[in-house]
Structures are given as structure tokens and as C-alpha cells.
Regions:
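Conserved small/polar residues in nucleotide/adenosyl-binding loops
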Residues: 180-185, 189
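ATP-dependent carboxylate-amine ligase catalytic core
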Residues: 2-17, 23-111, 119-143, 151-159
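Conserved anion/nucleotide-ligand pocket segment
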Residues: 163
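Short hydrophobic alpha-helical runs that function as membrane-insertion/retention elements
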Residues: 115-118, 173-175
Length: 191
């Protein structure tokens, strides 16, 4: 079974967008994916449900013991070709923001899942490698297995992917393009 957790250095990096894109791709390929969300969040699972047409499951290491979370995960994933978990907030951000307890990393560690790290290359290039290396070294094992770039232009991906692979030792698995939108009146645009 294909299984992994999608995480990011911080909120607003595009975890939900990439999780839904990966779920849709797995569904199109006949993998019958199931989805999970770290913590008690009910909003992101609604997006998962919209993509899959099935329930998304919450896995919360604050409200449940690790063994309970492992059992809930195994039961919900049984019979599926893929299981995709979406982390919350930053990768190591757990209880109160000052602990890794109940963080995305804690969930990956509890379930033994590889982690795909979503990174937005906004206003940074080589510094991204330093940040990723910091995430790799902060806890052992980090479970980081690959990088996905979000809001990335194709020419920037061609430049960043080889550098990030060389500097971090992690494969860069792909990217989602920056989606340009028309300015709205709320953005100060006038007609």
C-alpha cells in the first residue's frame, strides 16, 4: 500500500492543496485512497471528502494514545491502495506550539510514515536547503522522504530541484504551478 504524510515547515504552505491533488491523482490511478488529518481539524477533511467522496479520518495524539491511533489508522486504511495523511501547522508544531507532542512529526513517527515536505520557494532559494536540513536534523528519525514545491514556476523548479536534491539529499518529487488570478476589488483593484 502507498502511504505517506504531507507536512510543511509552517501553515499556509499549501499542505491541503497538495494533499487533495495527490488524493485526486491516486484516485485517478485506481489506488482507492483513504485520507487522514492530524489533530481534531474538521475543515481540511471536508476538502479531502470533496475530492474522494468518502470520509476523512482524524488521528489525534492528544486525545488518543499512540496504540489507539495505530489501530484507528490500520482499520481505516485496510482494503485501500493508498493512505494519505495531512499534517497540521508546521512539521514539529505540537501542543501549545512549544512541544512536538501531537505534531505532524509525532504522527509520522507513531505510524512509521515517510513524509513529503511541502515547501514554497517564495523569496528564497539556497536558504530553503538550510531550512530543510534543519528540519531533517531536528529529530531522529525525521521521516522526511521527499520534497514537493508549491506555487512554483516551471523555470524556477528546473533551477531549484537539482540544487535542493544536492544540498539536502532528498528527492524533489514535483511541483504545483503558481496559479495567477485576476485582481479583485478587495485587493484594491479598480475597474
Amino acid at each position: 500500500m502507498i502511504q505517506f504524510l504531507v507536512a510543511a515547515p509552517c501553515s499556509g504552505s499549501g499542505k491541503t492543496t497538495l494533499t487533495c491533488a495527490l488524493l485526486a491523482a491516486l484516485k485517478r490511478r485506481g489506488q482507492d485512497p483513504c485520507s487522514f488529518k492530524s489533530g481534531p481539524d474538521y475543515i481540511d477533511p471536508m476538502f479531502h471528502r470533496a475530492v474522494l467522496g468518502v470520509e476523512s479520518h482524524n488521528l489525534d495524539l492528544f486525545f488518543s494514545a499512540p496504540e489507539t491511533v495505530r489501530v484507528l489508522y490500520a482499520q481505516a486504511a485496510a482494503g485501500h491502495g493508498a493512505a494519505v495523511c495531512e499534517g497540521a501547522m508546521g512539521f514539529y508544531d505540537g501542543l501549545g506550539g512549544v512541544s512536538d507532542t501531537a505534531s505532524a512529526w509525532h504522527l509520522a513517527d507513531t505510524l512509521g510514515l515517510p513524509v513529503l515536505l511541502v515547501v514554497q520557494p517564495r523569496g528564497a532559494s539556497l536558504t530553503l536547503a538550510a531550512q530543510i536540513n534543519g528540519l531533517k536534523q531536528f529529530r531522529t528519525p525525521s521521516h522526511l522522504a521527499g520534497i514537493l514545491l508549491n506555487d512554483c514556476a516551471p523555470h524556477l523548479y528546473a533551477l531549484l530541484a537539482p540544487m535542493l536534491e544536492r544540498e539536502t539529499g532528498l528527492p524533489v518529487l514535483g511541483y504545483l504551478c503558481l496559479l495567477y488570478t485576476s485582481p479583485s476589488p478587495r485587493d484594491g483593484a479598480t475597474s
